[in-house]
Regions:
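Long, solvent-exposed, polar/charged low-complexity segments
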Residues: 2-8, 12, 144-187
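Extended low-polarity, hydrophobic cluster-rich segments
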Residues: 19, 56-59, 81-89, 163-166, ...
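Surface-exposed polar/charged interaction patches
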Residues: 22-26, 92, 108-111, 172-176, ...
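Intrinsically disordered, low-complexity regulatory segments enriched in Ser/Thr/Pro
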Residues: 58-157
């Protein structure tokens, strides 16, 4: 007898299938799927092994600088994962003050993503070459939703529904005028 409900997801593959089903049902296309297995950790993770999956989705008719990236992980501690809307933004010099931009992105996330879930936002900056002008740094935002263990434990249908709701929230984010104003022009 196990401690898991009969419909609980306890391994990586059913979690991949449920998330993928939810995102595809929302109209996005699978761009890629990568699975990895890691062994022989040292230190804190000594004796552990993990299996991870990365799924990438795009819209056929959508902007090319937008994707949904999904990270799923199976460890001896259980399953976990997150879904992220990844959006390229204007160059750093055109974004304005970082604190203001990050605050705006946080407000957009809070207003759009499903309530009751952890929804971190990250703003990444990258210089193409170390000596480049910092003002020309590429900027990218990731609006994330962490998949709750309780939802994973609730099974396939719960994950599909959360994945669909998250994609719909991501699409609302993409329609927000405040986000569009700091995205590169289309074309």
């Amino acid at each position: 007898m196990t401690d898991f409900p009969s419909n609980s997801i306890v391994t990586l593959e059913p979690l991949i299938e449920a998330v993928q089903e939810g995102v595809l049902a929302a109209g996005w296309q699978l761009s890629g799927l990568q699975k990895t297995t890691s062994h022989q950790f040292e230190g804190r993770w000594d004796g552990e092994s993990t299996r991870s999956a990365y799924l990438f989705f795009h819209l056929d008719a959508g902007p090319q600088d937008v994707s949904i990236d999904v990270y799923l992980d199976e460890t001896s501690r259980g399953l976990m994962g997150n879904m992220a809307l990844v959006v390229d933004l204007l160059e750093l010099q055109d974004l304005g003050r970082m604190q203001t931009s990050l605050g705006l992105l946080g407000e957009l996330s809070e207003a759009s993503l499903p309530e009751g879930h952890r929804t971190p936002v990250s703003l990444r900056l990258r210089l193409r070459e170390a000596g480049d002008d910092p003002g020309a740094a590429e900027a990218q935002v990731r609006f994330k939703l962490q998949l709750p263990r309780a939802t994973i434990g609730a099974g396939h249908v719960a994950i599909v529904e959360l994945a669909q709701a998250t994609v719909q929230a991501f699409e609302r984010l993409l329609e927000a005028e405040a986000l569009r104003a700091i995205m590169p022009p289309v074309g």
